Amino acid sequence: MAADEKAQANGEQAKGKVKKVVGGAAGNESLKGKGHAEESKGDLRAAKEKAKDAIKRK
């Protein structure tokens, strides 16, 4: 996994988790939803990079 892509994925996941927690605590469903979406985006980016690494190994 490229280091910059991995860092970006981890950053998106962390930001998403924070937004979900803050949105849930504040009762802000919009922020909570945006956090969930951002966390999912980070998860997908990480999965994409892992798949690319697996293909390169073969």
Swiss-Prot record:
InterPro entries: CsbD, YjbJ_sf. Residues 31-58 have a biased composition (Basic and acidic residues). Pfam families: CsbD. SUPFAM superfamilies: Hypothetical protein YjbJ. It comes from the Bacteria. Belongs to the UPF0337 (CsbD) family. This is UPF0337 protein SAV_738. The lineage of its organism: Bacteria, Bacillati, Actinomycetota, Actinomycetes, Kitasatosporales.
